[in-house]
Amino acid sequence: MKRVMLTAVLLLASAALWAQTTLKNGMAALEEKYGVRFVYDASLPLEGRVESVTGTDLEECLEQLFAGRDIRYEIKGNHVVLRKVRKVTLSGHVMDASSGETLIGAGVFSGNIGAVTNSYGFYSLTVPEGDIELSVSYIGYGRKTLKLRLEKDWTQDVALIPDARIRAAEVTGWKDTGIGATSLGALEIPQSVIRRAPMLLGEADVLKSLQLLPGVQSGSSGSSGLYVRGGGPDENLILMDGIPMYNGEHLLGLFSVFAPDAVKKVTLYKSSFPARYGGRTSSIVDVRMNDGNAEGIHGSVTVGLLTEKAHVEGPIGPNTTFSLTGRVLHTGLVELVGRPLGLPANYFFYDVHAKVSHSFGPRDRVFADYYRGKDYFRTDSQEYVFDHHYDENYAAYDRYTDTRSQFRLRWGNTVAGLRWNHVFGGRLFSNTTLSWSGYRSNMLTMGEENVDDDGYRTLARNEFQYFTTIGDATPRTDFEFTPSPAQTIRFGAGVTRHVFIPDGMSLSLREEAGGKIVRDTLLQRSEGTYMPGWEASAYLEDEISLGRVSLNPGLHFALFSASGKNYPSFQPRLSARWTVTDSWTLKAGYSRMAQYVHRLPFARVNLPTDIWVPVTDRIPPQESDQWSTGVYYTGIPGWSLSAEVYYKDLRNILEFRNNRLVFSGADQWEKTIATGIGRAYGAEWLVEKTAGNLTGWLSYTLSRSERRIPDGSINDGRWFPYVNDRRHKISVYGDYSLNDRIDFSATWQFASGDRMTLPTRHSFTMGEDGLQEQLYIPSRNNWTVPPTHRLDVSVNFRKKKARGERVWNVGVYNVYAARNPDFMIYNENRRWTYTLPDGTTQSSLDQEEIPEGRIYAIKRSVFSVLPSVSYTRTF
């Protein structure tokens, strides 16, 4: 017994000794125990202590002794040769095995070292030389594992095989968006949601899908406009493959310009903006387009109630691919569908997106993008009147009057870009872009009157045209440097030449009498006010992982020069993530943004004729400071929960002054605009089910957005609600796969009403012409519109074919026919007096519950129950 106890004491003492020894003492102990000698260079770092060594043989002891150190050992007879581990860089692209399309945000791991592919599917991983096991995963794809022996820097492309059985909505580990990202407020909406979520008339829509996310409000029902965290629709930077677009809507806002078949990935940033983004104050919508299938010709054709779409992609030779997508509106069905919507019969829109990519090898790729979209509508009216007239001698004659009017409105975007990707040695990735983004709208009104007085003909015709044009030319270079798996440094710079022509117009008048021209005058003609501007930007951000803590500090610098004045802007950014446990994560962030362009409404509602203008020597850039924090939980398999709060300060916001609610020309607009401050704050909750046959989410947003004009020109200098200040918003999305042939999806949305300015009564003021009556408005945006809510459902019937599949989509928009306030009008509550058959008189008010003479709002609903059906054939 004593012998056993003595042995135990010696073993414990030995263990304690090992636990407290230094690395060199541990090496000396192994030399004594196993009769070996260590051979190494004097510069080899052998400092530090050994936690514990409990191996039963020399090999196991050496593994434990040098674990976690950049030291490699080799046993040669009685010698153990030590040398410093050399690091090598493994880089390449992750792609879809069936199409060759690069995958954005794929996770690449070797042990506890990981990376994520960037916007071009590129990854860079620095690992110790020798044998490694590489694991690559991506949502909706089978995981792939490779065993590699690395003795030098190496390029390894990885192709993943799609797996329809994998329905998880997240990838464990490293991500650019969601819980795994350092920044908060970055959300990626899956392609399955974009293509399967029920939408108006069955048209899958990128921007409307974003409206299902917390913190994102819509405009009127059916609109694809975005109001993010208390901001306006012009405060969202919409990027198509990194190129800004000024108008993202078709059909007066009912559809977005992005055809889902051409889209690879959509990411929304609403806070903690990475330093590489700038130019808007509320959100960044980064839309990445397909590169093209490298394995064969594939595509799809879709016929719906309103549009026809076609998409085709494939290889052009061994290293070149293309992607081509087109969409047109059914003009024949617009009258049937558009009449109850108040749309003109003669309406047409189209868009086309083309992309070609070429690989010169593992280090160089070139991409060419082109997009063009246009909307056009025209209304014509004609009226004939026949009546009898008498001349000064009381002689009768016949008069024929032919009155005609015409209205045309055209608008559209043109975007083109050329990009070059280059890899410098595996750790440094660059992307150089030359791009053009243009937008133009044109409005024409014409009135004509032809009069025939017994053969004597006269004509009077007037014509008014108005156009606005924007053109941006931009060279830009971005770099991504990965010195280690725990650090990614991004930096870059660009210059944009802006040209704004907001007010081109012409006004002409022509008169004829008896076949002779009496007057043919161009009353006014202007090629528009030429408003150029230069915008330069540069940025630096450093994403660092320090164990459970990740940081992304950055700085974005911008300089805008216009109207002889320079506006520099230093915009610090900081994001932090703390992984408290495997289930709980905390995040916080701060970002400053600046915006140098503004959209001014041409009328009282948003139209494609709205005017974009740059900052001037009188109107400074709009700025915002946003603080946000959030908590995230993933402890329940297949579920994730998150809660975020934010506060945003706004400076130099623009509001039309009282009684000046419309644009009045580029030379006058500064006089109708007041600048002020704003604030927006709120909380957002999101519950996601991310795995299984049933997936989806529930989100709730509680928010407030206000404005104030300190000079008192609006609302006497008091705070007033922003026009899209909606207190509550609830979104529910669900997707259920019954089997591989049938799937269902449904959305239910509720939102508090937005704000409008409503006169409350008539008042009288003394003017130059005496007592004058006018409407009295107590405050700006003083009335809350009724809330909106609706349920949309959709079902897909799929059938595999020898090549591709057939899909029938049947949906219903606004299932229970909610009478939502699609637009509002106001009226005066009048008393009407009428006589009954018995001779007595009675009177009544339009609205008995409202005092006589009071102004009240009337709700008008456009979208009732709308069924839809579409047919898609893929090949």
Which residues make up each language-model segment?
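Outer membrane beta-barrel strand-and-loop segments of large Gram-negative receptors
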Residues: T468, D472-R476, E527, T616, ...
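Gram-negative outer-membrane beta-barrel transporters
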Residues: Y647-D649, D667-T760
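Short, acidic, small-residue-rich periplasmic hinge/interaction motif at the N-terminus
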Residues: M27-Y34, R69, I75, H79-F109, ...
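Surface-exposed extracellular loop regions of Gram-negative outer-membrane beta-barrel proteins
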Residues: E383, D387, D582-W627, Y647-E670, ...
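Predominantly transmembrane beta-strands of Gram-negative outer membrane beta-barrel pores used
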Residues: L237, K265-R276, S282-N290, I297-S359, ...
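Periplasmic N-terminal accessory/gating domains of Gram-negative outer-membrane beta-barrel systems
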Residues: F66-A67, V116, F122, G140-G142, ...
